[in-house]
């Protein structure tokens, strides 16, 4: 459980000179907060049609989302460790699933950002034949499983962690429910009906609200109780 303060994010001068647990928790909170912002900005500027014709924007958007994913992974560690002793097996399972999902997703983003545009420019037929174009579904069963596994684990993992935090009242319920709703919508996005997928702005706002809110509260932690 954490208790928050209404003052600035910085602590005492002596504490700020050392990487105390409190400072590390604050950094985790800031990482989560920034992860939501970077991922959302990256999503909004991402060209969803063709990489070669929008190479600069395509690369910039992916770098933002990759940065958001890395910060999310770092912040996730602090988010879990602060309340680890109270969360039990469900919380641990959620943390591990969410961490694995982010690693899988970062691998997919690396391919999409740096390798896909080069292959698409040289052999577009190869990309289309395997269903690797934006909005397409991979043809190969193994690739399809990996493609869907990342976002599904993200939804399940973060939802389990969020519900565990809700059970021990680690954060205000509205913030946790916003986080849970956001990760479920983002994680299960590939499986949702087209009508829901068209509400990308709404989904992004819900997710960003939840992850930024929780990150802000974690960054303002006054006392850390494991």
List PLM regions with ranges:
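Hydrophobic, aromatic-enriched alpha-helical segments typical of multi-pass transmembrane helices
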Residues: 2-226
